[in-house]
């Protein structure tokens, strides 16, 4: 069981580094104005959950090292994931200096799990989220986020929390890039 978890984690680590490249590229593009029609967005009520993560500030260039450290520390501390790997991106990368962006990589965990530094135990508390499923290469998730933000604006919502991405494929290395699935959450409220 532990061996399979580690193998899957390594595959996820490599794939997530590609996903971050997509965020960086897409956030340098401005969203088109007008009605967004080629994306499905739903407003959902989600349950708060506990997760462990490694937090970073700055460019996404060390994502691979951060994921590797996360997985290593979880294994050392016997902290087991209770769901898909997540990435959380604080602030607005389209407006922020890339060297000041705060981001996290992590996994949902059992709330009784004991977590020690450098891992942090946190709780996702945003319960009203806009949700869209991005299907395709991780490098293009940023395009979906921009479309979701436009959808929020067009429908009278404002984003009021960090971007959360859930990486749904257990073994991204055995999935065609065009079939990779990333669920994107944007916390929101009526504007």
Tell me what each language-model feature is.
Residues 1-2:
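N-terminal hydrophobic targeting signals that begin at the initiator methionine
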Residues 5-191:
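A solvent-exposed interaction/effector surface
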């Amino acid at each position: 069981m532990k061996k399979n978890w580690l193998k899957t984690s390594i595959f996820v680590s490599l794939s997530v580094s590609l996903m971050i490249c997509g965020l960086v590229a897409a956030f340098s593009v401005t969203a088109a104005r007008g009605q967004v029609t080629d994306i499905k967005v739903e407003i959902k009520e989600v349950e708060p959950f506990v997760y462990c993560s490694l937090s970073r500030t700055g460019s996404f260039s060390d994502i691979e090292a951060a994921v590797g450290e996360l997985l290593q520390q979880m294994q050392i501390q016997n902290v087991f994931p209770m769901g898909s790997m997540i990435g959380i991106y604080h602030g607005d990368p389209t407006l922020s200096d890339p060297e000041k962006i705060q981001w996290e990589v992590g996994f949902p965990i059992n709330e009784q799990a004991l977590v020690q530094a450098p891992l942090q135990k946190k709780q996702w508390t945003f319960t009203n989220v806009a949700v869209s499923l991005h299907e395709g290469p991780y490098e293009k998730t940023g395009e979906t986020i921009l479309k979701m933000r436009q959808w929020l604006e067009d429908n009278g919502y404002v984003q009021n929390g960090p971007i959360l991405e859930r990486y749904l494929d257990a073994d991204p290395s055995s999935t065609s890039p065009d079939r990779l699935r990333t669920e994107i959450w944007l916390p929101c409220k009526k504007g």
